[in-house]
Amino acid sequence: MVTLTPSSASTPKTSFDFMKNNNSHSSLYVSSSSYLSSKEDALVTTKKLMEPSKTLNMSINPKQEEFGDEKKMVKKAPEDPEIGVFGAEKYFNGDMDSDQGSSVLSLTNPEVERTVVDSKQSAKKSTGTPSVRSESSWNSQSVLLQNKLVNSCNSSFKEKKNSNGQIQKVTNNKKSFLANLGCKCACSDGDSVDVEEKTSVKRSADPNISVITMRSSADMNTELIKIQKQEELSQRKSLEVFGSPVAIEKKSSVVQKKLPLPPWKSRTEEDDTKSEGSDSSSDLFEIEGLTGNPKPFLTRQGSDPASPTCYAPSEVSVEWSIVTASAADFSVMSECATSPVRRNRPTQIPRIPITAKSAPQRRKSSSSSGGNGFLMSCKSHKSVMVSGDLDRRSSMNKTQPSYVPRFPMETTKPKSFETRRRISNSSISHTQSSLLYSQ
Protein backbone atom coordinates (compact mmCIF):
# COMPACT_ATOMS: atom_id res chain seq x y z
CA MET A 1 0.00 0.00 0.00
CA VAL A 2 1.21 3.46 -0.91
CA THR A 3 -0.27 6.57 0.66
CA LEU A 4 -0.02 9.94 -1.00
CA THR A 5 -0.43 13.05 1.09
CA PRO A 6 -1.24 16.19 -0.88
CA SER A 7 0.08 19.56 0.18
CA SER A 8 -3.29 21.05 0.92
CA ALA A 9 -4.90 20.00 4.17
CA SER A 10 -8.42 20.18 2.89
CA THR A 11 -8.13 17.13 0.63
CA PRO A 12 -8.52 13.78 2.38
CA LYS A 13 -6.01 11.01 2.27
CA THR A 14 -6.33 8.62 -0.60
CA SER A 15 -5.06 5.12 -0.73
CA PHE A 16 -4.26 3.23 -3.92
CA ASP A 17 -4.14 -0.50 -4.03
CA PHE A 18 -1.62 -1.15 -6.80
CA MET A 19 -1.26 -4.77 -6.01
CA LYS A 20 -4.90 -5.58 -6.35
CA ASN A 21 -5.21 -3.62 -9.52
CA ASN A 22 -2.20 -5.31 -10.95
CA ASN A 23 -3.48 -8.72 -9.92
CA SER A 24 -6.87 -8.07 -11.45
CA HIS A 25 -5.33 -6.90 -14.71
CA SER A 26 -2.95 -9.81 -14.78
CA SER A 27 -5.78 -12.30 -14.26
CA LEU A 28 -7.76 -10.84 -17.11
CA TYR A 29 -4.95 -10.63 -19.63
CA VAL A 30 -2.68 -13.54 -18.96
CA SER A 31 -2.53 -14.60 -22.59
CA SER A 32 -1.73 -11.14 -23.88
CA SER A 33 0.99 -10.32 -21.33
CA SER A 34 3.34 -12.87 -22.83
CA TYR A 35 3.56 -10.91 -26.05
CA LEU A 36 4.53 -7.63 -24.45
CA SER A 37 8.20 -6.79 -24.24
CA SER A 38 10.01 -5.54 -21.20
CA LYS A 39 10.45 -2.10 -22.73
CA GLU A 40 6.76 -1.67 -23.28
CA ASP A 41 6.05 -2.69 -19.66
CA ALA A 42 8.53 -0.15 -18.42
CA LEU A 43 6.87 2.56 -20.50
CA VAL A 44 3.47 1.62 -19.17
CA THR A 45 4.59 1.70 -15.55
CA THR A 46 6.35 5.03 -15.95
CA LYS A 47 3.26 6.53 -17.50
CA LYS A 48 1.16 5.19 -14.66
CA LEU A 49 3.43 6.79 -12.13
CA MET A 50 3.59 10.10 -13.99
CA GLU A 51 -0.12 10.51 -14.49
CA PRO A 52 -1.94 8.68 -11.68
CA SER A 53 -5.03 10.85 -11.78
CA LYS A 54 -5.78 9.99 -15.42
CA THR A 55 -4.77 6.38 -15.74
CA LEU A 56 -5.84 4.81 -12.42
CA ASN A 57 -9.26 4.78 -10.84
CA MET A 58 -9.55 6.84 -7.69
CA SER A 59 -11.61 5.24 -4.96
CA ILE A 60 -12.10 5.72 -1.26
CA ASN A 61 -13.48 2.27 -0.50
CA PRO A 62 -11.43 -0.56 -1.97
CA LYS A 63 -14.36 -2.95 -1.69
CA GLN A 64 -16.23 -1.12 -4.39
CA GLU A 65 -13.24 -1.57 -6.69
CA GLU A 66 -13.25 -5.28 -6.02
CA PHE A 67 -16.94 -5.54 -6.85
CA GLY A 68 -16.38 -3.53 -10.04
CA ASP A 69 -13.51 -5.76 -11.04
CA GLU A 70 -15.60 -8.85 -10.49
CA LYS A 71 -18.34 -7.42 -12.69
CA LYS A 72 -15.78 -6.70 -15.43
CA MET A 73 -14.55 -10.26 -15.21
CA VAL A 74 -18.09 -11.60 -15.54
CA LYS A 75 -18.75 -9.41 -18.57
CA LYS A 76 -15.49 -10.16 -20.40
CA ALA A 77 -15.46 -13.90 -19.76
CA PRO A 78 -17.53 -14.80 -22.85
CA GLU A 79 -15.25 -12.63 -25.00
CA ASP A 80 -12.39 -15.17 -24.73
CA PRO A 81 -13.57 -18.21 -26.63
CA GLU A 82 -11.31 -20.62 -28.43
CA ILE A 83 -9.18 -19.28 -31.25
CA GLY A 84 -11.07 -19.47 -34.58
CA VAL A 85 -9.83 -19.70 -38.16
CA PHE A 86 -9.59 -15.96 -38.65
CA GLY A 87 -7.92 -15.56 -35.29
CA ALA A 88 -5.28 -18.12 -36.23
CA GLU A 89 -4.59 -16.31 -39.51
CA LYS A 90 -4.21 -13.08 -37.65
CA TYR A 91 -1.96 -14.77 -35.12
CA PHE A 92 0.38 -16.13 -37.78
CA ASN A 93 0.32 -12.88 -39.77
CA GLY A 94 1.30 -10.88 -36.73
CA ASP A 95 -1.91 -8.89 -36.28
CA MET A 96 -2.70 -10.33 -32.86
CA ASP A 97 0.20 -8.40 -31.34
CA SER A 98 -1.11 -5.06 -32.42
CA ASP A 99 -4.70 -5.87 -31.39
CA GLN A 100 -3.83 -7.16 -27.92
CA GLY A 101 -1.36 -4.40 -27.25
CA SER A 102 -3.93 -1.80 -28.16
CA SER A 103 -6.58 -3.48 -25.95
CA VAL A 104 -4.27 -3.46 -22.96
CA LEU A 105 -3.20 0.12 -23.44
CA SER A 106 -6.74 1.31 -23.96
CA LEU A 107 -7.34 0.92 -20.25
CA THR A 108 -4.44 3.11 -19.34
CA ASN A 109 -4.13 6.09 -21.69
CA PRO A 110 -4.65 6.83 -25.41
CA GLU A 111 -1.38 8.74 -25.61
CA VAL A 112 0.57 5.75 -24.29
CA GLU A 113 -1.25 3.54 -26.78
CA ARG A 114 -0.23 5.80 -29.64
CA THR A 115 3.42 5.80 -28.67
CA VAL A 116 3.56 2.03 -28.24
CA VAL A 117 1.88 1.28 -31.55
CA ASP A 118 4.07 3.77 -33.37
CA SER A 119 7.18 2.21 -31.85
CA LYS A 120 6.12 -1.24 -33.04
CA GLN A 121 5.44 -0.04 -36.54
CA SER A 122 8.75 1.80 -36.70
CA ALA A 123 10.54 -1.32 -35.45
CA LYS A 124 8.93 -3.40 -38.16
CA LYS A 125 9.53 -0.94 -40.96
CA SER A 126 13.08 -0.12 -39.98
CA THR A 127 14.26 -3.50 -41.15
CA GLY A 128 15.33 -3.60 -44.80
CA THR A 129 13.96 -7.07 -45.54
CA PRO A 130 10.17 -7.19 -46.01
CA SER A 131 8.04 -9.66 -44.07
CA VAL A 132 5.89 -12.52 -45.39
CA ARG A 133 2.78 -10.37 -45.15
CA SER A 134 4.27 -7.61 -47.26
CA GLU A 135 5.56 -10.05 -49.88
CA SER A 136 2.17 -11.70 -50.20
CA SER A 137 0.09 -8.51 -50.28
CA TRP A 138 2.28 -6.14 -52.26
CA ASN A 139 2.61 -6.20 -56.01
CA SER A 140 5.47 -7.91 -57.77
CA GLN A 141 7.08 -4.54 -58.45
CA SER A 142 7.54 -3.77 -54.74
CA VAL A 143 9.79 -6.85 -54.29
CA LEU A 144 12.24 -5.54 -56.88
CA LEU A 145 12.60 -2.16 -55.26
CA GLN A 146 15.80 -1.09 -53.59
CA ASN A 147 16.22 -0.36 -49.92
CA LYS A 148 16.55 3.34 -50.67
CA LEU A 149 12.89 3.63 -51.47
CA VAL A 150 12.05 1.94 -48.17
CA ASN A 151 14.32 4.32 -46.33
CA SER A 152 12.70 7.24 -48.12
CA CYS A 153 9.33 5.98 -46.91
CA ASN A 154 10.67 5.66 -43.38
CA SER A 155 12.05 9.17 -43.57
CA SER A 156 8.51 10.40 -44.12
CA PHE A 157 7.85 9.90 -40.39
CA LYS A 158 8.56 13.17 -38.61
CA GLU A 159 9.02 13.76 -34.94
CA LYS A 160 7.34 16.56 -33.09
CA LYS A 161 7.52 17.64 -29.48
CA ASN A 162 4.46 18.33 -27.44
CA SER A 163 4.16 21.03 -24.84
CA ASN A 164 4.92 18.44 -22.13
CA GLY A 165 8.22 17.51 -23.81
CA GLN A 166 7.01 14.13 -25.14
CA ILE A 167 8.26 12.94 -28.52
CA GLN A 168 5.42 12.21 -30.94
CA LYS A 169 5.87 10.76 -34.40
CA VAL A 170 3.65 12.13 -37.14
CA THR A 171 3.49 10.58 -40.57
CA ASN A 172 2.83 12.23 -43.89
CA ASN A 173 -0.54 10.97 -45.04
CA LYS A 174 0.19 11.03 -48.75
CA LYS A 175 3.47 9.13 -48.62
CA SER A 176 2.21 6.65 -46.02
CA PHE A 177 -0.82 5.97 -48.16
CA LEU A 178 1.38 5.26 -51.17
CA ALA A 179 3.66 3.12 -49.02
CA ASN A 180 0.77 1.01 -47.71
CA LEU A 181 -0.60 0.47 -51.20
CA GLY A 182 2.82 -0.50 -52.49
CA CYS A 183 2.99 2.11 -55.27
CA LYS A 184 6.74 2.48 -54.91
CA CYS A 185 7.48 2.14 -58.58
CA ALA A 186 9.35 4.45 -60.93
CA CYS A 187 6.07 6.06 -62.01
CA SER A 188 5.95 8.19 -58.88
CA ASP A 189 8.98 10.28 -59.86
CA GLY A 190 8.46 13.80 -61.08
CA ASP A 191 10.44 13.25 -64.25
CA SER A 192 8.36 10.27 -65.23
CA VAL A 193 5.20 12.29 -64.69
CA ASP A 194 6.56 14.97 -66.97
CA VAL A 195 7.42 12.35 -69.55
CA GLU A 196 3.89 10.97 -69.38
CA GLU A 197 2.52 14.45 -69.82
CA LYS A 198 4.71 14.93 -72.85
CA THR A 199 3.56 11.67 -74.34
CA SER A 200 -0.04 12.55 -73.59
CA VAL A 201 0.49 15.90 -75.25
CA LYS A 202 1.94 14.15 -78.26
CA ARG A 203 -0.98 11.78 -78.43
CA SER A 204 -3.43 14.61 -78.10
CA ALA A 205 -1.53 16.57 -80.72
CA ASP A 206 -1.58 13.76 -83.27
CA PRO A 207 -5.29 14.15 -84.16
CA ASN A 208 -4.82 17.90 -84.20
CA ILE A 209 -1.98 17.47 -86.66
CA SER A 210 -4.15 15.26 -88.82
CA VAL A 211 -6.93 17.82 -88.66
CA ILE A 212 -4.45 20.56 -89.55
CA THR A 213 -3.19 18.56 -92.51
CA MET A 214 -6.74 17.97 -93.68
CA ARG A 215 -7.50 21.65 -93.33
CA SER A 216 -4.33 22.58 -95.18
CA SER A 217 -5.19 20.19 -98.03
CA ALA A 218 -8.70 21.64 -98.19
CA ASP A 219 -7.24 25.16 -98.25
CA MET A 220 -4.90 24.16 -101.07
CA ASN A 221 -7.83 22.78 -103.06
CA THR A 222 -9.81 25.97 -102.56
CA GLU A 223 -6.79 28.07 -103.60
CA LEU A 224 -6.36 26.00 -106.76
CA ILE A 225 -10.04 26.47 -107.58
CA LYS A 226 -9.71 30.22 -107.04
CA ILE A 227 -6.63 30.37 -109.29
CA GLN A 228 -8.47 28.48 -112.02
CA LYS A 229 -11.42 30.85 -111.77
CA GLN A 230 -9.10 33.86 -112.01
CA GLU A 231 -7.46 32.40 -115.11
CA GLU A 232 -10.86 31.85 -116.68
CA LEU A 233 -11.85 35.43 -115.93
CA SER A 234 -8.59 36.73 -117.39
CA GLN A 235 -9.17 34.68 -120.53
CA ARG A 236 -12.67 36.05 -120.82
CA LYS A 237 -11.39 39.60 -120.49
CA SER A 238 -8.52 39.05 -122.94
CA LEU A 239 -8.51 39.81 -126.68
CA GLU A 240 -8.93 36.17 -127.53
CA VAL A 241 -12.57 36.34 -126.48
CA PHE A 242 -13.40 39.98 -127.22
CA GLY A 243 -11.10 40.25 -130.21
CA SER A 244 -11.90 40.72 -133.89
CA PRO A 245 -14.09 38.08 -135.57
CA VAL A 246 -11.50 37.65 -138.32
CA ALA A 247 -9.01 36.14 -135.88
CA ILE A 248 -11.68 33.80 -134.51
CA GLU A 249 -12.59 32.72 -138.06
CA LYS A 250 -8.92 32.11 -138.82
CA LYS A 251 -8.57 29.95 -135.74
CA SER A 252 -11.69 28.00 -136.60
CA SER A 253 -10.42 27.48 -140.16
CA VAL A 254 -7.08 26.22 -138.85
CA VAL A 255 -8.85 23.79 -136.54
CA GLN A 256 -11.05 22.59 -139.38
CA LYS A 257 -8.00 22.04 -141.55
CA LYS A 258 -6.29 19.99 -138.89
CA LEU A 259 -9.24 17.67 -138.34
CA PRO A 260 -9.31 14.87 -140.93
CA LEU A 261 -12.69 14.27 -142.53
CA PRO A 262 -14.04 11.47 -144.76
CA PRO A 263 -14.22 12.18 -148.52
CA TRP A 264 -18.00 12.44 -148.78
CA LYS A 265 -18.13 15.01 -145.99
CA SER A 266 -15.22 16.97 -147.41
CA ARG A 267 -16.94 17.23 -150.81
CA THR A 268 -20.14 18.53 -149.34
CA GLU A 269 -18.22 21.05 -147.25
CA GLU A 270 -16.29 22.27 -150.30
CA ASP A 271 -19.52 22.78 -152.22
CA ASP A 272 -20.98 24.66 -149.29
CA THR A 273 -17.93 26.90 -149.01
CA LYS A 274 -18.03 27.64 -152.75
CA SER A 275 -21.68 28.55 -152.62
CA GLU A 276 -21.10 30.72 -149.55
CA GLY A 277 -18.19 32.45 -151.25
CA SER A 278 -20.20 33.08 -154.41
CA ASP A 279 -23.11 34.47 -152.42
CA SER A 280 -20.80 36.76 -150.51
CA SER A 281 -19.18 37.96 -153.75
CA SER A 282 -22.57 38.66 -155.35
CA ASP A 283 -23.60 40.59 -152.26
CA LEU A 284 -20.42 42.62 -152.55
CA PHE A 285 -21.19 43.39 -156.21
CA GLU A 286 -24.61 44.62 -155.24
CA ILE A 287 -23.18 46.76 -152.46
CA GLU A 288 -20.65 48.27 -154.83
CA GLY A 289 -23.40 48.99 -157.31
CA LEU A 290 -25.38 50.80 -154.67
CA THR A 291 -22.50 52.78 -153.23
CA GLY A 292 -20.68 53.51 -156.47
CA ASN A 293 -22.02 54.13 -159.96
CA PRO A 294 -25.68 53.17 -160.36
CA LYS A 295 -24.93 51.65 -163.79
CA PRO A 296 -21.45 50.15 -163.74
CA PHE A 297 -21.88 48.51 -167.14
CA LEU A 298 -22.19 51.99 -168.71
CA THR A 299 -18.96 53.33 -167.24
CA ARG A 300 -16.31 54.65 -169.54
CA GLN A 301 -13.45 52.28 -170.23
CA GLY A 302 -9.87 53.32 -170.65
CA SER A 303 -9.75 51.87 -174.19
CA ASP A 304 -12.81 53.83 -175.35
CA PRO A 305 -11.59 57.28 -176.39
CA ALA A 306 -14.74 58.19 -178.34
CA SER A 307 -17.27 58.26 -175.53
CA PRO A 308 -16.91 61.64 -173.80
CA THR A 309 -19.76 61.05 -171.38
CA CYS A 310 -20.98 58.14 -169.29
CA TYR A 311 -24.07 57.62 -171.47
CA ALA A 312 -24.34 55.84 -174.79
CA PRO A 313 -24.35 58.26 -177.76
CA SER A 314 -27.69 58.85 -179.44
CA GLU A 315 -29.25 61.44 -181.71
CA VAL A 316 -31.02 63.23 -178.89
CA SER A 317 -27.89 63.31 -176.79
CA VAL A 318 -25.84 64.62 -179.70
CA GLU A 319 -28.34 67.35 -180.36
CA TRP A 320 -28.45 68.31 -176.72
CA SER A 321 -24.69 68.45 -176.57
CA ILE A 322 -24.58 70.73 -179.60
CA VAL A 323 -27.12 73.08 -178.04
CA THR A 324 -25.24 73.29 -174.79
CA ALA A 325 -21.94 73.82 -176.57
CA SER A 326 -23.33 76.65 -178.65
CA ALA A 327 -24.77 78.24 -175.56
CA ALA A 328 -21.44 78.05 -173.76
CA ASP A 329 -19.48 79.01 -176.90
CA PHE A 330 -17.62 75.76 -176.80
CA SER A 331 -17.15 73.45 -179.75
CA VAL A 332 -17.74 69.86 -178.80
CA MET A 333 -16.87 68.67 -182.27
CA SER A 334 -13.24 69.63 -181.80
CA GLU A 335 -12.80 66.44 -179.85
CA CYS A 336 -14.64 64.39 -182.43
CA ALA A 337 -12.52 65.77 -185.23
CA THR A 338 -9.45 64.06 -183.89
CA SER A 339 -11.02 60.60 -184.07
CA PRO A 340 -10.52 58.49 -187.23
CA VAL A 341 -13.38 58.68 -189.74
CA ARG A 342 -14.61 56.26 -192.38
CA ARG A 343 -16.90 57.64 -195.01
CA ASN A 344 -18.12 54.36 -196.39
CA ARG A 345 -20.29 53.34 -193.40
CA PRO A 346 -23.41 55.25 -192.49
CA THR A 347 -23.90 56.88 -189.17
CA GLN A 348 -23.95 54.19 -186.53
CA ILE A 349 -23.96 54.13 -182.83
CA PRO A 350 -20.60 52.82 -181.70
CA ARG A 351 -20.73 49.46 -179.98
CA ILE A 352 -19.57 49.62 -176.41
CA PRO A 353 -18.09 46.44 -174.90
CA ILE A 354 -20.22 45.34 -171.96
CA THR A 355 -18.15 44.43 -168.93
CA ALA A 356 -21.06 43.42 -166.73
CA LYS A 357 -21.64 39.72 -166.40
CA SER A 358 -24.51 37.62 -165.29
CA ALA A 359 -24.75 36.23 -161.78
CA PRO A 360 -23.57 32.65 -162.53
CA GLN A 361 -20.61 33.97 -164.55
CA ARG A 362 -19.63 36.24 -161.70
CA ARG A 363 -19.90 33.35 -159.24
CA LYS A 364 -17.68 31.17 -161.41
CA SER A 365 -15.08 33.85 -161.85
CA SER A 366 -15.09 34.66 -158.14
CA SER A 367 -14.84 30.99 -157.15
CA SER A 368 -12.03 30.34 -159.64
CA SER A 369 -10.06 33.40 -158.65
CA GLY A 370 -10.85 33.32 -154.93
CA GLY A 371 -9.37 30.02 -153.83
CA ASN A 372 -10.41 29.72 -150.20
CA GLY A 373 -13.96 30.64 -149.35
CA PHE A 374 -13.02 32.19 -146.02
CA LEU A 375 -10.85 34.89 -147.62
CA MET A 376 -13.22 35.61 -150.52
CA SER A 377 -14.29 38.91 -149.03
CA CYS A 378 -10.72 40.19 -149.23
CA LYS A 379 -10.18 39.23 -152.88
CA SER A 380 -13.58 40.08 -154.32
CA HIS A 381 -12.59 43.55 -155.52
CA LYS A 382 -9.33 42.28 -157.00
CA SER A 383 -11.13 39.48 -158.78
CA VAL A 384 -13.49 42.00 -160.40
CA MET A 385 -10.55 44.07 -161.54
CA VAL A 386 -8.87 41.04 -162.98
CA SER A 387 -11.98 40.08 -164.91
CA GLY A 388 -12.24 43.61 -166.25
CA ASP A 389 -8.64 43.46 -167.46
CA LEU A 390 -9.32 40.21 -169.27
CA ASP A 391 -12.32 41.66 -171.02
CA ARG A 392 -10.29 44.64 -172.09
CA ARG A 393 -7.56 42.44 -173.54
CA SER A 394 -10.07 40.35 -175.43
CA SER A 395 -11.71 43.47 -176.84
CA MET A 396 -8.32 44.85 -177.91
CA ASN A 397 -7.39 41.63 -179.69
CA LYS A 398 -10.60 41.67 -181.73
CA THR A 399 -11.12 44.03 -184.66
CA GLN A 400 -12.35 47.19 -183.12
CA PRO A 401 -15.20 48.89 -185.00
CA SER A 402 -14.19 52.07 -186.78
CA TYR A 403 -15.74 55.12 -185.29
CA VAL A 404 -17.96 57.02 -187.70
CA PRO A 405 -18.02 60.78 -187.48
CA ARG A 406 -21.20 62.16 -186.13
CA PHE A 407 -21.43 64.71 -188.85
CA PRO A 408 -20.69 63.53 -192.44
CA MET A 409 -19.73 67.01 -193.53
CA GLU A 410 -16.47 66.72 -191.64
CA THR A 411 -13.40 65.72 -193.58
CA THR A 412 -10.71 63.32 -192.54
CA LYS A 413 -7.96 65.88 -192.66
CA PRO A 414 -7.71 68.41 -189.94
CA LYS A 415 -8.31 72.01 -190.99
CA SER A 416 -7.43 75.30 -189.55
CA PHE A 417 -9.14 76.72 -186.53
CA GLU A 418 -11.25 79.17 -188.49
CA THR A 419 -12.61 76.57 -190.86
CA ARG A 420 -13.51 74.35 -187.92
CA ARG A 421 -15.34 77.21 -186.33
CA ARG A 422 -17.32 77.93 -189.42
CA ILE A 423 -18.31 74.29 -189.77
CA SER A 424 -19.44 74.16 -186.22
CA ASN A 425 -21.49 77.33 -186.57
CA SER A 426 -23.17 76.06 -189.68
CA SER A 427 -23.98 72.75 -188.06
CA ILE A 428 -25.46 74.51 -185.07
CA SER A 429 -27.67 76.64 -187.28
CA HIS A 430 -28.91 73.53 -189.11
CA THR A 431 -29.75 71.76 -185.89
CA GLN A 432 -31.62 74.74 -184.55
CA SER A 433 -33.72 74.99 -187.68
CA SER A 434 -34.48 71.28 -187.55
CA LEU A 435 -35.54 71.56 -183.95
CA LEU A 436 -37.84 74.45 -184.75
CA TYR A 437 -39.46 72.50 -187.58
CA SER A 438 -39.90 69.47 -185.40
CA GLN A 439 -41.66 71.44 -182.73
Swiss-Prot record:
Location relative to the cell: Cell membrane
Induction (record text): Up-regulated by white, red, far-red and blue light.
Bilayer disposition of the protein: Peripheral membrane protein
Residues with Phosphoserine modification: 238, 244
Posttranslational modification: Phosphorylated on Ser and to a lower extent on Thr by phytochromes. Phosphorylation is stimulated twofold by red light.
Phenotype upon gene inactivation: Increased hypocotyl growth inhibition and cotyledon unfolding responses in the very low fluence response (VLFR) mode. Reduced phototropic response. Reduced hyponasty when grown under blue light. Loss of negative root phototropism. Auxin accumulation in protoplasts.
Location (main, coarse): membrane
Biased composition (Polar residues): 1-14, 100-109, 118-139
GO cellular component terms listed in the entry, alphabetical order: cytoplasm; plasma membrane
Tissue-level expression: Expressed in young seedlings in both darkness and light. Moderate in leaves and very low in roots and flowers. Expressed in the elongation zone of the root and hypocotyl.
Biased composition (Low complexity): 424-439
Keywords: Cell membrane, Membrane, Phosphoprotein, Phytochrome signaling pathway
Biological processes per GO annotation: phototropism; positive gravitropism; red or far-red light signaling pathway; red, far-red light phototransduction; response to far red light; response to red light
Extent of Basic and acidic residues compositional bias: 63-79, 412-421
Segments for region (Disordered): 1-22, 54-80, 100-139, 259-311, 355-439
Paired cysteines (S-S): none
Function: May be responsible for light-regulated cytoplasmic sequestration of phytochromes or may be a negative regulator of phytochrome B signaling. Component of the network that modulates the very low-fluence response (VLFR) branch of phyA signaling. Acts positively in PHOT1 signaling. Regulates phytochrome-mediated photomorphogenesis and hypocotyl phototropism. Involved in the control of leaf flattening and leaf positioning. Promotes negative root phototropism and negatively regulates root gravitropism. May act by controlling auxin homeostasis.
Protein family (similarity comment): Belongs to the PKS family.
Assembly mode: Interacts with PKS2, RPT3, PHOT1, PHOT2 and the C-termini of both phytochromes A (phyA) and B (phyB). Binds both spectral forms of phytochrome, Pr and Pfr.
Miscellaneous comment text of the record: PKS1, PKS2 and/or PKS4 are essential for phototropism but not for inhibition of gravitropism under long-term blue light irradiation.
Listed name of the protein: Protein PHYTOCHROME KINASE SUBSTRATE 1
Naturally occurring in which organism (per UniProt): Arabidopsis thaliana (Mouse-ear cress)
